[in-house]
Amino acid sequence: DLVANQLDDHSASVCLDIGSNDGLFLQTLKARFGSEILGIDPAHAPAEHARSQGVETWEEFFSDDSVLRIKDRFKKIDVISANNVFAHNDDLISFATNVASLMHDGSVFSFEFSYLVDVVEKGLIGTVFHEHVSTHSLLSLIPFLNRCGLDLVDIKRIDTQGGAAIGFAKLHSAKAPVSESVANLLLLEHKLGLDTARGINIFRDRIMADKIKVAELLKPYAGETVGGFGAARSANLLIDFFELGPFLNFIIDDSPQKCGKWLNAFEVPIL
């Protein structure tokens, strides 16, 4: 709804969702705007489910080749979305440049990303793991988008994964007005010292203090039966950083795909 509300003033005749998963977001746009929709997602199971729900989905990565085929079919796209995709992409310059090439001056690009302010303020070490190759501040994001021909025109903070943000970008040629929220968050980032090493040092000091607290908390339970809850993607990172391996006897998870397996690098069974 947050993204859909942002699009009320924009034409949404053709919508593309990159990393479209089960197609639910595209279904929302189609129901609200009557849009022609297309999803791109390389994962077979969610792509197949999306197609079963009537959402056209190309089972592939967003690439130079897919961009050419999109242009052949639609010429330009009105709304492009990429929810929780930025952090997983190791070539953001090509990604954003390709997005910009599909846009016209009335197009909008909405994207969710891991927000550095939340990571620093809340000590979100669990978001820093092998699948997440980037975390952005606006201080880094704005010049990056400019390099790719895009301007950040609005920003909304959300609670996903402890703290993230949704950015809205338009082509630089559109000369679109910039929301006050962008300037407000830039001011906050300067106050937190994210334009220097100071802000990152605050994050380092916080998680090191948390590590000491966890060690003190677990010390009385050495030799006892200790279980964990949730074999999340970040579990290996947390176990390694907080040195939990010697204490954990098992981890409980409600995912049938994980039960009966072991955490990588640790002899901790998942029940």
Indicate where each model-derived feature is located.
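Conserved class I S-adenosyl-L-methionine
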Residues: S11-N21, V226
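Conserved SAM-binding loop of SAM-dependent methyltransferases across substrates and taxa
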Residues: D22-F33
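Class I SAM-dependent methyltransferase SAM/SAH-binding core
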Residues: A31-S66, F250, P256-K258
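A solvent-exposed beta-alpha-beta segment
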Residues: R51-Q53, E216-L271
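A conserved beta-strand element that flanks and buttresses the S-adenosyl-L-methionine
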Residues: D78-S81
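A short glycine-rich, Lys/Arg-flanked "PGG" loop and its adjoining helix->strand segment in the class I
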Residues: I93-V108
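Short, glycine-/aromatic-enriched active-site segment of Class I SAM-dependent methyltransferases
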Residues: F109-S134, L138-L141, L145
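Flexible, glycine-/basic-rich loop-and-beta segments that form/coincide
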Residues: G162-I207
